[in-house]
Amino acid sequence: AGEDNYYDGAKNLVRSEDGKSYIAAPISGWVQGIWYDKEKLSEAGFSEPENWDDILKIAQHFTDKENKQYGIAMPTAEGTMSEQAFSQFALSNGANVLDDEGEVTIDTEKMREALSFYQNLSQYTMPGSNDVTEIKDAFMNGTAPMAIYSTYILPSVYEAGNSENIGFAIPTQKDQAVYGTVSGLTISSGLDEKQKEAAEAFTAFLSQPKNMEKWVLMSPGGAQPVNKQVVELDGYKENEVIKSFGELPSEI
């Protein structure tokens, strides 16, 4: 598909440690951020949240625990999704687990600020251990007007006929930061020559734009293209789910 046709973000995630090559051929990805109900926020006098303070103010405004209404559906369970969600806020505050020299930098002021904010924000989410199902359900049934979730919420939003009413915000403090991941095709070491040839042929086949298009359209909106050629294909552009979200897929 040509190296230059892949988005830089996808290439960076599969780049080798020395930066000289790649460890996989990207095929799709997904991005996590803050999804919000445009109508509810607008009716309450809020525009798209642009920073931590905006997110907190909106979450506070909509929280009415007596009536089981909450400002934001966010991960609180001990697990991967909570790690992913918190990492966005840490990165947006300039905090990271490792510095440029590979030294551990967990116990820093920036990291403590991010943790404090995440703890504060969690006051305005549903009680208990919230994970993938609880977060998605709360946003989809109107319990919360904001949710920290991946692009895999979009197929459900489409099915609910609410595509035009969803917005996407990026947690921002010192920087903009989202959590995302890329699925890549790899070829194992230790294969015999025939196996290696077959693996290379299959990787080349799936890396053709038309086949990558079919791959991401197995979950339109959820799986995101990592190759610029895919978004120019008629099948992708004319997909009913993709079309329903207008400019949102290209913004993501």
What role is predicted for each listed range?
Residues 1-6, 39-50, 145-146, 156, ...:
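Extracytoplasmic "Venus flytrap"/periplasmic binding protein-like
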